[in-house]
Amino acid sequence: YNQNSVLERRRSMIRQTKTENGLVRGIEAADPRITAFRGVPFAAPPTGKNRWRAPLPCENWEGIKDCARFAPISVQDTPGIGDSLYNREWHVDQDVPMDEDCLYLNIWTGAKSVDDRRPVLVWYFGGGYQWGYTREMEFDGERLARQGVVVVTVNYRVNVFGFLSHPQLTKEQPEAPSNFGSLDQKAGLEWVVRNIANFGGDPNKITIAGQSAGGASVMSQLACEENEGKISGALVMSGMIGSPYEKTRFGTPTPLATAEQIGKDFFEFLGVKTLEEARALDAFEIRDKYSDFAKDHPRMYTVIDGVFCKEDPYKKMLEGRGLLVPLMAGNTSDEFLNHIEAKDGEQLLKKAEELFKDKADQFLSFEENKKQTPEGFSPVSGIEYSVKRAFLSRKATGCNQNSYYYRFDADIPGWDNAGTFHSCDLWFFFETLAKCWRPFDGHHYDLARQISSYFVNFIKTGNPNGNDYNENKLPEWKPYC
């Protein structure tokens, strides 16, 4: 054991570096070859008169900013309350600091020099645009950083703070009438482009990724023309949620006029008439009122505002528009299953004829489409359908970038028999199984090694194939089409 060599190796890591606003100091991760910079500001606090505005630039600071701890999470319902599946799985700390001043990001890097130019992952968390934060255990970027990428997790405003619309907002700031959370994500990406070289990252090799609402956020960023040239690849995990049996999709952006009416109703519920009054209220009072409001009204999320979001990002992808980059997307096997509601075979035939017209017989010729469950007939993953439809459309419209589909179907242990539930794949992509309460065993860790290696290869090259980090050749993963 050579203590001097260990100390020398630690000194060779990037523990301190500069950003456009000042110096930052990180902290060694559990693996001393990795430096974690937590709570790095990328925009000014969206508080006071900056509430419900596009993110503004940070002010410069003197000295060295200590970035050893995570910054407060964005204002939302208090995490960690109750014994639901997701509280048990992720939101385990009801005392986690929370503040409207929340526009910070976190960086994990194993670079030894600012000249390393490592590929970069920019991650957006999920939570239905209502909840979620970067300090969730599963998003620890250390394991991925060990494989030679720089990992960045971006915090953003959620719920009413991130997605309020109102006629007064549209009139006062037509350049940014809504989608403040999406603009936070975009500002985080732009900060990475400008600053990540000082953390050993390559600003010309950035993959954006996210899960659930984070995956839908990736779709929104790909649809934004202003991001042209900033994104070299994308991963959408469980973020395209549709159904072959319905005309509408879950999470389709809200038209501005509809969103403005929801905002007007909320102001009335809040007991205010003007933006000035609303901006003067305490953030936690607004949060609590919004939670009550959402019991009987639609929640606030992405809006077709004509500026950041000009149309449905999924529709744009189907038509071969938006940023065309290598794309990986998929789903877990037990999430968002859709069914045909029918009580027997006769009613199934009638429903099939309504849905598929002259192709009903062809649909029913597949035995799996006659399968009946307690929820109905013909169970199918709405996400799998949506992803494959998008991939086929990309190909048909002339996109020459590869599309890689995955279906995550691991056995998930635990007394709750939760199945392959929505979000369980996050432990595997980030290879953070050891942080979870579930009794994962050796074959789960082997699977996580393979999955994270596919993910890292994709970040590095736009192609998941190659070797895992132990230099074992991975099974070939062919493009979907």
Map each language-model feature to its residues.
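Alpha/beta-hydrolase fold nucleophile elbow
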Residues: 200-211
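Alpha/beta-hydrolase active-site loop
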Residues: 175-197, 257-261
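Active-site rim elements
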Residues: 91-95, 174-179, 246-254, 369-383, ...
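Short, Lys/Arg-enriched N-terminal segments with co-localized hydrophobic residues
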Residues: 1-12
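Non-catalytic accessory segments of hydrolases
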Residues: 12-179, 203, 296, 440-451, ...
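Substrate-access "cap/lid" subdomains that shape
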Residues: 194, 220-223, 228, 233, ...
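Mobile gating loops/cap/lid regions near enzyme active sites that modulate substrate access
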Residues: 80-81, 389-481
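Glycine-rich nucleophile elbow surrounding the catalytic serine of serine-hydrolase chemistry
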Residues: 210-220
